[in-house]
């Protein structure tokens, strides 16, 4: 790594630490030429390929925005939405791919959102899965009921 002070082409890593729940690596570096120290931050870039074919960087902020819209008027606090977005990011990063289709990001949102708030889940799923009729909603509600009964043991 080039020194930002004297432009010497090499530096020595003095210390490395994880940051942002393991999503970043902060490295403290020292320049052998001028002796000054500086910090670098490394992050693995995750790209999302949209339906149109356009690629853009993964954005936890976009996840939070979409989930907030689905949760509008529901008793869901901001911390729960932020935690859901973190879980989604961890899930998609765990796949190990540098690029993934937006469809997979949507799937990663649906599970945690269903656990957080079923009405918000229905709202999100209706847009994500392009519900076109009342029958689509009825099918999804029946799926939710069946899952709830299975959890309750009856």
UniProtKB/Swiss-Prot annotation:
Binds 1 zinc ion. The keyword Transcription applies. The keyword Transcription regulation applies. GO terms for biological process: negative regulation of DNA-templated transcription. Its cofactor is Zn(2+). Keywords: ATP-binding, DNA-binding, Metal-binding, Nucleotide-binding, Repressor, Transcription, Transcription regulation, Zinc, Zinc-finger. Residues 46-136 form the ATP-cone domain. A zinc finger (unnamed) spans 3-34. GO terms for molecular function: ATP binding; DNA binding; zinc ion binding. NCBIfam families: transcriptional regulator NrdR (TIGR00244). Belongs to the NrdR family. Negatively regulates transcription of bacterial ribonucleotide reductase nrd genes and operons by binding to NrdR-boxes. This is Transcriptional repressor NrdR.
């Amino acid at each position: 790594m080039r020194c930002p002070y004297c432009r010497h082409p090499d530096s020595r890593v003095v210390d490395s630490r994880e940051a942002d729940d393991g999503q970043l690596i902060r490295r403290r570096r020292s320049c052998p030429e001028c002796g000054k120290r500086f910090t670098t931050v490394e992050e693995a870039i995750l790209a999302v390929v949209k339906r149109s074919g356009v690629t853009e960087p993964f954005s936890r902020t976009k996840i939070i925005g979409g989930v907030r819209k689905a949760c509008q008027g529901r008793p869901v606090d901001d911390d729960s939405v932020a935690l859901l977005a973190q879980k989604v990011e961890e899930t998609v990063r765990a796949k190990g791919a540098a690029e993934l289709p937006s469809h997979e990001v949507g799937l990663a949102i649906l599970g945690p959102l269903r656990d957080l708030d079923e009405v918000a889940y229905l709202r999100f799923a209706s847009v994500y899965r392009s519900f076109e009729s009342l029958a689509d909603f009825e099918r999804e509600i029946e799926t939710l009921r069946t899952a709830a009964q299975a959890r309750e043991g009856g």
